[in-house]
């Protein structure tokens, strides 16, 4: 059920924060935004503007936004995309009392338009020191967090796996949109080599196949069929978030295979659920993973290295389970949603 539209009566005067999500497609940015927004709404008078509003935060629409014009008391406009920064800059120029904040996850040099937009912000958050290093101004580093209650290990992982009615005893997964940037092809290549040697494992790919990636996905399916592994490499397509959480709980091993990434939320989601990790050196992997303790790192784009790193865990599921327990503790200690919310809240308070 959607939260009610909030801007009525005194709410327009009390509003402190607008969380923007001006994007039609559900993405990793949307996921991180949705997770932390209700926590922030517990600390500030907040409203969500845009699609995919989560429970726990009031919603607003364009009509509600119009009611804030020429209000004296400032309101934080928290943007995570270029179009949201553009909207904030324009509204502020036209008289809306906005304090502009941008969260940057990109680990690359920004385009000129993004650099200009960033220069117009009142404050910047970077999701890692690496992301901060690409900015031309100071930023507060606040790493992403995950809801460790929702992404929790199952009481009985064997029973959780059995619910899926898949062959074998263990699951190894790779989650995210099916495309080359996410390295789905690397995972398929590794599984085509490893699964024949480890019959107790089934591989699961969870993520959307967008229209522009149908050809890419069909080529993966051809490889899987040629290897005779149609029943042991399962591509689910896009799933509701509660189904995705259920799949995390079934995993013994998680492969993070991105060639490039901003942060890579699936890293900490899988760790929180107690999966052992093998990850490419993309996004926040080098920050999140303790090499040899909570996971292992491999170069990006290297299917052979990925295969080599995954095999010892598939050979010894008990060792993978122990590594997953350390991974879970690492998230509890360093990457909880509460810690992220506290870090963002400190920036908000400076702006207000």
Residue ranges, per PLM feature:
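Short hydrophobic beta-strand element within catalytic cores of glycosyltransferases
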Residues: 276-280, 289
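A short, well-ordered alpha-helix in the C-terminal region of glycosyltransferases
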Residues: 312, 319-334, 340-343
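Nucleotide-activated donor-binding/catalytic signature segment of Leloir-type glycosyltransferases, i.e.
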Residues: 217-238
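Conserved donor-binding/catalytic core segment of Leloir-type glycosyltransferases
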Residues: 163-182, 188-193, 204
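Aromatic "clamp/platform" in nucleotide-sugar-dependent glycosyltransferases that forms part
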Residues: 259
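Conserved acidic donor-binding segment of nucleotide-sugar-dependent glycosyltransferases
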Residues: 291-292, 296-304, 312-318
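Donor nucleotide-sugar binding/catalytic pocket of nucleotide-sugar-dependent glycosyltransferases
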Residues: 118-157, 166-167, 174
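Short alpha-helical donor nucleotide-sugar binding micro-motif in glycosyltransferases
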Residues: 238-239, 246-251
